[in-house]
């Protein structure tokens, strides 16, 4: 448009043999596509599991709060991409064998270990908070992640917090919206978790009459207090991961998450939707 030189075409010079052409002949030649370098976007980044981002704010394992804090460091370093391993729930046996992040029990549910308890809020009982602060220091002092201890501490904390706020949840618009928007997967997931605990195994083939998913039974379980607690956990996880992703975006950081190829054979999806597995 401005009659300015833009770019030379790449590759060898294009050649046409006209030595045998006669007067009046015209050669129509198609040499394929224009050979110019792609204008691809490139950026530096870091690949790191969330569980490795442990900080003084953690309870023995990296959490979604640490994920947001790590984005701050990346922005200072001029990096743009933060790749993490899957953060889906993998709970089957409640021990270290559940730690493999690709053996997920739900496509949608997030792992309770990634809860940032600071964001959940302090407990009303100051003596309990002092006790949890001591246990946090003990977990953070380890040079490894004590998987079982982390799970116990976070579950204890969240159950106490749930008891504090459960009577107010029906008036919490954000919680109600989360439940309404996600009940399609929360219903089978909460039922799966409850039956896993009742049968002491995630292998649903061993659940007797519950080995085959029954929507009506899942609806019955949905109304119990333990199912609501599980949804409460997922609500906080969803909120915290969303907040971390938005914070990273504000810093110019894109979070790229690994996704498992499939789900565990003993998963909520495989149980509730056997026809597609």
Residue ranges: model-predicted function:
Residues 38-274:
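Acidic/aromatic-lined carbohydrate-recognition and catalytic surfaces
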Residues 1-30, 73, 96-99:
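Alpha-glucan (starch/glycogen) binding determinants
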Residues 27-39:
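Basic K/R-rich, polyanion-interacting modules in nucleoproteins and related proteins
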Residues 277:
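Conserved active-site neighborhood of enzyme catalytic/cofactor-binding cores
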């Amino acid at each position: 448009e401005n009659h300015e030189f833009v770019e030379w075409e790449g590759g060898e010079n294009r050649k046409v043999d006209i030595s045998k052409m006669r007067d009046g002949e015209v050669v129509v030649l198609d040499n394929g596509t224009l050979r110019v370098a792609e204008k691809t976007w490139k950026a530096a980044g870091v690949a790191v599991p969330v569980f490795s981002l442990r900080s003084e704010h953690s309870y023995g394992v990296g959490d979604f709060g640490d994920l947001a804090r790590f984005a701050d460091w990346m922005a200072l370093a001029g990096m743009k991409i933060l790749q993490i391993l899957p953060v889906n729930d993998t709970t089957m046996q409640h021990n270290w064998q559940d730690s493999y992040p690709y053996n997920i029990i739900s496509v949608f549910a997030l792992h309770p270990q990634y809860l940032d308890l600071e964001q959940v809020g302090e407990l009303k009982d100051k003596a309990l908070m002092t006790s949890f602060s001591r246990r946090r220091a003990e977990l953070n002092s380890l040079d490894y992640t004590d998987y079982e201890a982390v799970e116990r501490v976070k579950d204890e904390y969240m159950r106490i917090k749930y008891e504090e706020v459960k009577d107010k949840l029906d008036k919490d618009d954000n919680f109600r919206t989360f439940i309404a928007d996600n009940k399609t997967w929360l219903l089978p997931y909460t039922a799966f978790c409850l039956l896993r605990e009742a049968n002491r195994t995630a292998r649903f083939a061993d659940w007797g009459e519950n080995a085959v998913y029954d929507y009506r039974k899942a609806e019955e379980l949905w109304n119990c207090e333990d199912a609501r607690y599980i949804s409460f956990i997922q609500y906080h996880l969803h909120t915290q991961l969303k907040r971390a992703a938005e914070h990273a975006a504000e810093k110019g950081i894109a979070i790229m998450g690994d996704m498992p190829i499939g789900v565990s054979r003993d998963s909520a999806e495989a149980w509730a939707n056997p026809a597609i597995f």
